[in-house]
Amino acid sequence: MQTIAIVDYGMGNVRSVQKALEHVAPNDKCILTSDPKIIQESDRVVFPGQGAMGSCMRALELNDLISEIKLSSKSKPFLGICLGLQLLFGYSEENNGTNGLSIVPGDVIKFNNNDLKIPHMGWNNVNQVNNHPLWNKIDNNSRFYSVHSYYVNPTDTSCVVGMTEYGHSFASAIAIDKIFAVQFHPEKSQSDGLQLLRNFVEWN
């Protein structure tokens, strides 16, 4: 039995992530936690998030989680979801400029096309532009559920493994070493989302 730590810092519906993981990994221990020690001792980490990036960074600081998130992202399988993807980057345009965790070089940019509905909300295709174990048994251009007003712009585009079209193409999934992070919500994306979580649980 392995332990999967779901980082709970008060931002977003982490219980839905926990329930989805418990469904695909019934023999594993899926813990909601804000305790850096539990995260450190876990086998895998899931880093979800919703809301404003500035508020999330303050919550991470208050819970003394920043150093452990940085360590875990380099030492064990690590899945970022939605704002959990954006927080990995160095800088966001949100809140008149917000610094992130600077784990992944690049920026977080607001959709600025006046013809688009913001936030980008609903189902959209993800083009698997690079192979990765977390795409196993998921058809290319499968649809996933998203809710976001900002998108990530990595400095090194070789880390991009998924692209989505909304006004223009943007990175909706990245992978660097032990990190896999997505803009969409696998826990809300029915069978393909559950398959991605299953792949994460089995990824070595």
Give each language-model segment a name.
Residues M1-A5:
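Extreme N-terminal starter segment of soluble prokaryotic enzymes
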Residues K29-E41:
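Short acidic low-complexity segments
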Residues I39-G49:
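Short acidic/histidine-rich motifs immediately flanking catalytic phosphotransfer sites
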Residues G51-W123:
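Cysteine-nucleophile active-site neighborhood
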Residues G90-Y166:
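Pocket-forming structural segment of enzyme catalytic cores
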Residues H168-A175:
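Short, surface-exposed beta-strand/loop micro-motifs that present aromatic residues
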Residues V182-N204:
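Acyltransferase
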